[in-house]
């Protein structure tokens, strides 16, 4: 398991952009359209809204629709 889990969908342009920017980085990817429990977690941290991409870090923090550079910086900080 990596230090980063990305909650996304395959139809979301923001998700595709983030994943493209993270090319070469290690992360776990969960499709919230396929995993109802994951979708509920996303809603729980986004005021009841299923906003993707949402990123969960191994230190317990999370970010909604972050820039790839922000995720990479956090990956490096957690390494």
From Swiss-Prot:
Domain Glutaredoxin: 1-79
Subcellular location: Cytoplasm
Coiled-coil ranges (or none): none
EC primary class: oxidoreductase
SUPFAM superfamilies assigned: Thioredoxin-like (SSF52833)
EC number of this enzyme: 1.20.4.3
GO MF annotations in UniProt: oxidoreductase activity
GO cellular component assignments: cytoplasm
NCBIfam families in UniProt: GlrX_actino
Biological function: Involved in defense against toxic arsenate. Involved in the mycothiol/myoredoxin redox pathway which uses a mycothioltransferase mechanism; functions as a monothiol mixed disulfide reductase and is recycled by a second mycothiol forming mycothione which in turn is reduced in a NADPH-dependent manner.
Name under which the protein is recorded: Mycoredoxin 1
Gene behind the chain: mrx1
